[in-house]
């Protein structure tokens, strides 16, 4: 029986339902979120509620943690879990700076724990079906793949009630680039066994961004400038 702690109510509830459907032998023993209104929705008395993240990581009954917090918190939560010897399943991206990634990698090795980056798009039904067909040789000898993941996040980057930026909006404000590259290259890696066990690895990866102009347009539709 695996005792699981969850960080992040919204996606955390989804993962609980998925595990139940799969009939996996697990217990959700703890949940942390900084939104008190969401935590009050949890009716299961066996799940201990935490409003302080340090207290959450100090809870001795957690074997593994599912991290579904906003992007900027992923590395901090992962490092805290690793220091406690807790196995980790973390949403993407795992980190935002190379130095953070190296620190996490070294800590995982030192603590001898399991870490998995939850690149969910690899397991989308269409990608699983495509991988199966590729493995069967239905597309012959593949020498070139072009892929893209398109997710229009403009509508979920700010509140339409008060204009306040969501965590996605805050990320866009400080960084105009692709912070989810694994959504595009993850499935391709699965198709071609790139980076898996003793298989081939990417020699280089390039990402290009353009000036972001559409966000201001859609924002002004909801919150037009007041005329003097």
Where are these regions (language model features)?
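N-terminal Rossmann-like dinucleotide-binding module
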Residues: 1-44
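Structural detector of well-ordered beta-strand residues that form the stable sheet scaffold
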Residues: 50, 89, 114-116, 146, ...
């Amino acid at each position: 029986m695996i005792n699981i702690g969850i960080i992040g109510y919204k996606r955390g509830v989804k993962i609980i339902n998925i595990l139940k459907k799969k009939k996996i032998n697990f217990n959700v023993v703890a949940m942390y979120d900084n939104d008190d209104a969401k935590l009050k929705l949890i009716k299961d008395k066996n799940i201990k509620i935490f409003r302080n993240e340090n207290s959450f990581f100090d809870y001795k009954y957690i074997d593994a943690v599912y991290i579904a917090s906003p992007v900027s918190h992923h590395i901090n939560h992962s490092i805290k879990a690793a220091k406690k010897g807790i196995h980790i399943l973390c949403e993407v991206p795992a980190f935002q700076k190379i130095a953070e990634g190296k620190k996490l990698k070294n800590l995982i090795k030192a603590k001898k724990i399991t870490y998995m980056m939850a690149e969910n798009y690899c397991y989308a039904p269409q990608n699983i079906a495509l991988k199966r067909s590729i493995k069967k040789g239905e597309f012959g000898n593949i020498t070139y793949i072009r892929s893209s993941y398109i997710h229009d996040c403009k509508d979920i980057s700010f509140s339409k009630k008060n204009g306040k930026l969501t965590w996605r909006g805050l990320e866009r404000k400080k960084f105009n680039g692709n912070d989810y590259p694994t959504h595009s290259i993850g499935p391709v890696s699965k198709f071609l066994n790139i980076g898996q066990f003793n298989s081939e690895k990417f020699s280089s990866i390039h990402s290009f961004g353009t000036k972001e102009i559409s966000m201001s347009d859609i924002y002004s539709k909801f919150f037009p400038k007041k005329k003097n």
